Regions:
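A preference for well-ordered globular domain cores
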Residues: 1-120
Length: 120
């Protein structure tokens, strides 16, 4: 399964403030060089946003993979052929997976704890 980059500190900074910054090192908010430090968000605010982004990452990846799998079968629903009951159930199970799955990431940043429906 394709894996995109995890959220990074720059993502948390961008979502925490409109304040301009010039640099940072790694994922350490204490290294951020602010252009106007008196208007900068606190390290706690940036860390909170960073944790929020990381907590949402498994569900974001689940939706991305689900959308890819649905797109693979779009031709079923848009072709002149009649879609079978198994095909219809498969597509519905993919749409419903975000309601039932509790996705997590393993040490390799791969989705685990997800049972995908079998493609007919």
């Amino acid at each position: 399964m394709r894996r995109l980059d995890r959220p990074r500190l720059r993502d948390a900074i961008k979502l925490s403030t409109d304040e301009k910054w010039s640099h940072y090192e790694g994922d350490d908010p204490s290294t951020i060089g602010w252009i106007n430090p008196e208007n900068a968000p606190s390290i706690e605010q940036i860390n909170a946003k960073f944790q929020e982004l990381n907590a949402a990452e498994p569900m974001r990846l689940l939706r991305e993979e689900r959308n890819r799998r649905i797109a693979e079968t779009d031709w079923w629903a848009s072709s002149d052929l009649l879609i079978s009951d198994d095909q219809r159930k498969y597509r519905q199970a993919l749409r419903d997976i975000t309601k039932t799955a509790d996705p997590q990431l393993n040490e390799f940043d791969e989705l685990i704890n997800v049972t995908w429906p079998e493609k007919p």
